[in-house]
């Protein structure tokens, strides 16, 4: 009789729904309707109502939280003459209730609000609640029967999402009653919809705890997807008919049928009646049965029959008498936590007490609120090994060159280039290579500072030594007054030291005020949401200091350019390094031409490191090869004789030089008396003969045998100055010439 009456009421309500194009419906969800979960089923209910009532103005909005909901909804209520607002989530409840209270007695705004909950209904506020503890209990029974390992995992929103663990407990007690040996592990996610946490937590339940059955009360199917990816059967326990999508990969699912409740509620609003409060659960009347169960083909018939029979018992039993309200575990729990029990039966928890279950019951294993562990992304080990091996090989090669410098230090090619400064340059290259090895190594605050120190000091040593030793060549050769110049290595060391001191001071400032340190950075490069990378970072003061260091290096290079330009006229290969320095600068410029645009454009940290290290290797190696290969080549070709006959002669003294000049003068006079043309004595420079503007290589004669050029000019050699340049001390006078009288020069005559 009751069944007949309820059916008639439902038919009367549905038949009295007048299709109306003017009825306006708004539905609020907290997530996309494509979530294959709760929001999708709410949308299915909206579509069912819209079709049944021919509603043309049926809108759906994704919104969450009180403030967002209020800001979205209030203008619509005020301006659009909305008939019904379905606030599907408890997230919407506060805002919907506030707006409903604002217009409860409004003569113009007649909007009805459907909210989740079991509170009091008003003239424009409808309450609906559904009991998913009952369907969780049925799902738990299925999981307990299905598990092979007797290990079940579960994910819940938890108290952080205003959700207690009573429904987790309902699932557990269902599994426990059919399988007393089951172990039950569960996480609280902190939200109904957090795919990242859901995926990670599910993976942990499978990999760490060995669960072979996973269930949840979340809005989407992320947990089920992870289970399927791990070759396990999934359970659809979020209200969406997952088996319709995933087929036999989902062995059990239940679906919410919101149309069965939204339709009569919308019909009541359209007819002007106040629906009041609604309660959804298993129901013996199919028109009001909220849950639709679906089983896989591999589920035994006995299991199906047991669960269907149990769901019918729940449908005909008052909620207070359900098994999850009354059992030996909950009786102990109520005593332990002093929760209210039912007046008629103290071994059963009351409805109010049920919603305060937030601690594990019985042997439930609570794993805590899940937080995703950040994954550290390391620098590519293959790149690290590659740069380290290449740098190590180059260090070995440079050490061999240093040995070669020491071994061939007495050859003109090496001696004329100052062996000690050549080795300084090579040491600078080694320091740079070591800096590159550290640059690609594991990042720490010490590493961040060390790599800048090493690379800058190495560069200062390499370039500074080249510039200083070539500066000496310039001073000696650019000497029109024919003065004997004494410039020893000890006089040049302070200048190299000055280059290093400037570098050290700037780096000390960078270290002290730049706050250069290693930090754990997220959201950079292509890192995932829960990935991080350790990078070096400095503040703006440090960046300014770094620019100053780069400016200092630029100035050092410009000085090198100037010096190389000044010694370009020295036509003895051993002394003239202008081409080598120029080629080195070309290599540096080429790298800068490529690097600067790349560094200005957005780069991933690993790509940036690779570019910088490749550039460092190329610049350093190119500079060393350009400067040193020609020297060793001349050693190989010419040996101890050098490229110029001057190196084959006995070292001369300054007196010998004066004698050569006098002889040159006499030869010039003799040539004039014999009728020859006037012969000019070229006195520019005191090592090489000929005009410095002449790019052709000059021929050197013996000290006491001046020679003539094709144009009749008499060349003057000055082996004494060569001796002074190639020795660390001033050149000695020949013993046989010490007591000789000075030769008169032209001015003395």
Swiss-Prot record:
The lineage of its organism: Eukaryota, Amoebozoa, Evosea, Eumycetozoa, Dictyostelia. It is a multi-pass membrane protein. Its main location: membrane. The keyword Membrane applies. It is found in: Membrane. GO terms for biological process: G protein-coupled receptor signaling pathway; response to folic acid. InterPro entries: GPCR_3_C, mGluR/GABA-B-like, PnrA-like. The keyword Ribonucleoprotein does not apply. Residues 1-22 form the signal peptide. GO terms for molecular function: G protein-coupled receptor activity. It comes from the Eukaryota. Residues 698-716 have a biased composition (Polar residues). In the N-terminal section; belongs to the BMP lipoprotein family. The chain crosses the membrane at residues 386-406, 420-440, 457-477, 493-513, 545-565, 580-600, 610-630. This is Metabotropic glutamate receptor-like protein M. Residues 23-385, 441-456, 514-544, 601-609 are extracellular. Residues 407-419, 478-492, 566-579, 631-749 are cytoplasmic.
